[in-house]
């Protein structure tokens, strides 16, 4: 009897911790607008248009206006004013670029994948 109870509890615990994750490689978490080349660092910056709390959770820092320097933004998306959908991760120290500290300073993000939003 104790063995059956133990097995039943174990099964319940195992299944209660299972949840479905979205592992579809064609989905994007976030949306942003490309702002243009940042004059301080020479790298394009983007402004997230939604999900700022998710950006903060991924990156670990946030800005009031949602602007970040976007390392690894694909060349075909480096056009001011276009809307994009993208996945990001926190940038590693070794991936940071040099900035002049003469202009506005924004946190960096690393773009994993991105594509243009077609209206």
Regions found by a protein language model. Name each.
Residues 58-76:
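Beta-strand/loop nucleic-acid-binding surfaces
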């Amino acid at each position: 009897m104790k063995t059956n109870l133990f097995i039943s509890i174990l099964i319940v615990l195992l299944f209660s911790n299972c949840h479905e994750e979205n592992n579809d490689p064609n989905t994007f978490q976030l949306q942003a607008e490309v702002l243009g080349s940042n004059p301080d660092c020479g790298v394009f910056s983007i402004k997230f248009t939604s999900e700022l709390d998710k950006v903060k959770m991924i990156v670990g820092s946030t800005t009031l206006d949602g602007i970040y320097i976007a390392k690894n933004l694909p060349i075909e998306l480096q056009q001011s004013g276009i809307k994009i959908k993208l996945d990001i991760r926190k940038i590693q120290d070794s991936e940071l670029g040099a900035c002049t500290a003469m202009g506005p300073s924004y946190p960096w993000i690393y773009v994993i994948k991105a594509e243009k939003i077609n209206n």
